[in-house]
Structures are given as C-alpha cells and as structure tokens.
C-alpha cells in the first residue's frame, strides 16, 4: 500500500507538471506583447529549460505531497486509536471495588450466595472535588440473551441509572441515528425496558416494542453454569453504538489463533437488574473535573479506604497508546522520511539553481550590457522561481490531498485492522498543514538567500565586458 501510494504521487506529479508546462505557455502567450524584457526573458528561459527543471520539480511535488500524506496518515492513526479508546471506556475513569461474597445453606441444603455492598456515598462525596459526576454501572460480559428461540451466550448486559449515566458517560456524536440521550429517555420511561444493539435487532428482526429475555449466571463456580434468573424486557430503543460496548472482541480459539467474536448488547434499568438478579458487584464510572487526573481520583478514593481491585483510565490508556512501540516507530518513520526528503530537496534545489546561474553568467552580462539593471535580473529570477518551483509546490499540496483521500484509509487499516463500532475516518489538522508550509517556506528562504549571495559575488563586471564585446 505504501508503494502504491508513492507511485501514485509520483505519477500524478508527472501529470501535474505536464499541465503546469501548458499553463506557463498559455500565460506566456497571453501577455507576450505586454511583458517587460525581464519577465519576457524569464518565460523564454522557463520554456527552454522545462525538461531540465522537471527533475527538481518532481522532487518538490513528491516531497510536499509525501509530507502531507505522512502527516495526515499519522494524524489519522493517532486520532482513530484515541477515539476507539474513548469509546471503549465510555468515560474518564472506571473503577471496580473489592466486594465481599457470603454464602449460606437453606433448609433444603441448597447453597445461596449474597454480596455485601459498600456505601456508595463514599464515591458521591468526590463530586465537586475530583469528579463532576459518578454513577453505578452493572457490567456483565457473560450474560445470555434469549431471542428467536435461541440463546446468545457471551453477550453484554449493562444496568444503568439513566440520568446519572447520561451525565457521566460520553459517546461520540454521529454514531447513532439520533442523540443517545433520547434512547436513555426512552429507557427511563419503562421500568422493564431495554436498549438493544442493532446487530441483535437485525439478527432476529426485533423491533421497538418487542420483548426479549436475558439471563445472568450465578457467581458460584460449579460443573455447569447456573442461571440466576431470566427476566423479560421490552425493547425501548435500538442503537448502533453505546458507551463502553465493544461489538467485536478478539479471542483465541481452540487452535490458539485469534478470531473475531461478535457480541450483542442489552441495557436495562439498574433497579430492575438488581431486583431480578440480586445485588452484584458493579463498576463505578467517574467523569473527572477539569484539571484533575485519574491519579488525583485514585488518591481521593484511597483516602476513603476503598479497596480498588481494578481500574481503567482514559488518560492512562491514551498515554500507553501514544508510547506504544508501533505508534512511536510509525510517527518516527514518517517524520524522518519527511526530514530526509526536505534535506535532499533543498540540496538538489540549490545544486540546480547554482549550476543554472553559473552557466548563465555570460547571459547576465549580455543583459546588463543591453541596459537591464540588477533589479530586473533579480525580478527575472524571481519570476522563474514562481512559475517553476512555487507552482510545483502548490501542485504538491494538491497531489497530497488526492493521495490522502485515496490511500489514508487503506493504510490505516494496516494499523487498525480490528472491526469496531467506530469506522476509520480521515483526520486532518490544519496546524499540521501550517507546519508543513512553514518548513517549505523556510527551505525556499534559505535557498533564495544562498542564491542571492552567489549572485552578488558573481563577477558581473567581467561578464559585462564580454557582453559588450
């Protein structure tokens, strides 16, 4: 894919340069009778040396186009990874407290279990200090959904308080047909209501208003899994995406190979889930206050003597992603390739123009002998730069845009091969374009300064005498 994108940039660069040549000829003919001697001479030089300038012009196009392509590629990979991490977690911080489980035996010698819930106010006390909002979320990724006469094991069940959850969780806009708050409002109106994922609805042709059953297994380990209960739920809404729900996960099969597993979602009211399955351990989702980090929240939790057995932090996950070897190598590779291309382009640019000016020293003397001032000679060189180097640079931006549209998503698939609720989207930051433009302008300024210095040191006086002769 990288080779194809490079060949595409090279081929389109050649095509664009051919079009630029015809554009220059058109401009030359339009003002042929009105150009000043300096401008006229510059157009003659451009049209006569178009083949010689072709190499450096192609280099300019490829350098700028590859710089833009690599920049957009790195931005797309980083942004899409960040979006997926944000979606997978659903909020800033998710903590799991250690719960105490007890058992007892009834008169029929049947074993029962129960959990002792800690005081949730220990978390709500953190609101206004390190957190803006906290909420309880029952999350079970080993639930069973019963629909269409079949059972879907390994499904995801979430029990939420709709108002608190809406204030705590986050979801990228545009993933559902309407704002996800509307789905929460629909769920809040029906005590036994459920929100289901669109893949479940499509699989069994379920519509809003239909009923499904879902079940959870007992936490007591035995030879066979035992269902706690199998309540019925009325479908209130169907969603394509929901905070914290990963539709696709990757697990090892019996052969030890990773395989894609599609999961299904049921979201129910927290109180209804507790009444149906008894009190079970839940996650605490936290939206951090501005300026507060997950470490601040963990310290505050520790100060409340809360025993946390597991936590997931958005900032921590994003930082680990940014510091992962794959991302670091990719970003470093793109940056290094652009720096090398800029250096080679600058060196080639200088070599070409220094050689060209040295070869035209006698010609400059003739122009001076004909009455052309140094100011007009400088004007002639500037015009040559505009219609050769600057136009090629602008063409590079156009080619870079085309390459970004056609190839960035394809290359991003290599770095983000997993199926996900969030499709890969091209990310372009105007600031990256500004930085690229600044580097290119700096390169041109350095080259112009060097060329100007060489031009001043040229022995124009001797060339002038030769021109007069």
Regions from the language model: what does each represent?
Residues 347-389:
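Interfacial "coupling" helices/loops that link adjacent transmembrane helices in transporter permeases
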Residues 2, 19-21, 54, 65-91, ...:
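Alpha-helical transmembrane segments
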Residues 23, 38-39, 356-365, 457:
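Transmembrane helix boundary and interhelical loop/hinge segments in multi-pass membrane proteins
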Residues 1-73, 391-394, 435-448:
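Alpha-helical transmembrane segments, especially those used as permease/efflux helices
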Residues 236-240, 264-325:
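"Rare, low-scoring activations can occur
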Residues 83-92, 98-218, 228-241, 253-257, ...:
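Short beta-strand boundary microenvironments
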């Amino acid at each position: 894919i990288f080779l194809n994108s490079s060949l595409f940039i090279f081929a389109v660069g050649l095509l664009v340069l051919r079009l630029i040549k015809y554009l220059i000829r058109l401009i030359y003919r339009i003002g042929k009778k009105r150009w000043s001697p300096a401008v006229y001479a510059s157009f003659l030089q451009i049209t006569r040396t178009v083949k010689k300038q072709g190499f450096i012009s192609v280099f300019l196009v490829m350098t700028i186009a590859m710089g833009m392509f690599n920049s957009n590629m790195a931005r797309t990979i980083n942004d899409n990874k960040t979006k997926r991490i944000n979606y997978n977690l659903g909020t800033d911080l998710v903590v799991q407290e250690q719960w105490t489980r007890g058992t007892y035996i009834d008169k029929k010698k049947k074993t029962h279990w129960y959990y002792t819930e800690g005081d949730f106010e220990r978390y709500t006390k953190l609101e206004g200090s390190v957190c803006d909002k906290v909420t309880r979320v029952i999350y079970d990724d080993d639930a069973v959904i019963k629909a269409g006469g079949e059972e879907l094991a390994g499904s995801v069940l979430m029990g939420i308080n709709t108002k608190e959850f809406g204030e705590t969780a986050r979801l990228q806009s545009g993933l559902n047909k309407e704002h996800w708050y509307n789905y929460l409002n629909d769920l809040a109106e029906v005590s036994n209501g459920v929100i289901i994922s669109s893949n479940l609805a499509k699989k069994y042709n379920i519509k809003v208003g239909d009923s499904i059953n879902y079940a959870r297994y007992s936490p007591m380990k035995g030879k066979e899994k035992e269902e706690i209960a199998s309540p019925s739920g009325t479908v209130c809404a169907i969603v394509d995406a929901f905070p914290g729900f990963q539709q696709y996960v990757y697990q090892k099969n019996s052969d030890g190979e990773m395989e894609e597993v599609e999961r299904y979602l049921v979201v129910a009211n927290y109180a209804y889930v507790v009444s149906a399955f008894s009190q079970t351990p839940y996650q605490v989702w936290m939206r951090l206050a501005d300026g507060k980090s997950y470490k601040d929240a963990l310290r505050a939790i520790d100060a409340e003597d809360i025993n946390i057995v597991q936590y997931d932090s958005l900032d921590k996950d994003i930082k680990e992603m940014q510091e992962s070897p794959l991302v670091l190598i990719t970003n470093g590779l793109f940056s290094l390739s652009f720096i090398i291309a800029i250096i080679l382009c600058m060196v080639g640019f200088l070599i070409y123009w220094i050689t060209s000016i040295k070869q035209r020293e006698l010609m400059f003397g003739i122009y001076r002998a004909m009455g052309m001032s140094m100011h007009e000679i400088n004007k002639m060189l500037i015009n040559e730069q505009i219609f050769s180097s600057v136009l090629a640079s602008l063409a590079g931006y156009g080619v870079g845009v085309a390459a970004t549209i056609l190839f960035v998503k394809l290359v991003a698939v290599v770095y983000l091969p997993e199926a996900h609720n969030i499709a890969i989207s091209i990310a372009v930051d105007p600031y990256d374009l500004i930085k690229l433009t600044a580097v290119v302008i700096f390169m041109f300024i350095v080259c112009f300064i060097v060329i100007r210095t060489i031009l001043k040191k040229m022995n124009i006086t001797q060339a002038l005498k030769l021109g007069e002769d």
